[in-house]
Amino acid sequence: MDVILLERIEKLGHIGDVVAVKNGYARNFLLPRKKALRANEANRKIFEANRAQIEADNAARRTDAEKESEVVNGLTVTLIRQASNTGHLYGSVSARDLADAIVEAKPEAKVAKNQIVLDRPIKSIGISEVRVVLHPEVAVKIKVNVARSPEEAELQAEGVDVMNQMFERDGASFTEDYDPNAEPGLATEAEEAVADADDNAETNSEESL
């Protein structure tokens, strides 16, 4: 389907561009959200008659978004979640969770969940970078610190790899104890002596029977 864009659409085009898109994308997203018009003769005339106003409205929204970006850009939000010993969350962090966290941290920010761009789900503890699209032409990045406790979040904020630290600690607990001063072969000889003693005991027991 050919449509006339009413705003910039990433990887698609700018205001006034006529582009070909899949029917489902147009019907389910572009048209109902008033981001585009069907590219027929009647709509072309309507667009050209209102183009100046459409562009002025877009510029005003962009200016507001640029002001908001000064508040949101570079922000770090912390989310405390339950997770397994391997760091996997019991459930993922959603776009709504992030939008709510941003507004809680910066009440003056008006960020909606549909402005959060999650390239991949956040399913484990750690620090992730997430893009927030405040306007089709204005995007910023925030950091998301997901941890199991405020103390853990603070360590991560300081650059500590909490999971790696935990694995190293657990691995150390399974290290076999040894005497660095022992002579090579002594342990083996002692084990063989014990085994021989056990064999002799079994033999004597059988002979007595």
From Swiss-Prot:
Gene Ontology terms for molecular function: rRNA binding; structural constituent of ribosome
One Pfam family in the UniProt entry: Ribosomal_L9_C
GO biological-process terms attached to the record: translation
UniProt-listed Gene3D superfamilies: Ribosomal protein L9, C-terminal domain (3.10.430.100), Ribosomal protein L9, N-terminal domain (3.40.5.10)
Family: Belongs to the bacterial ribosomal protein bL9 family.
UniProt-listed HAMAP family: Ribosomal_bL9
Name of the molecule in the record: Large ribosomal subunit protein bL9
Annotated source species: Zymomonas mobilis subsp. mobilis (strain ATCC 31821 / ZM4 / CP4)
Gene behind the chain: rplI
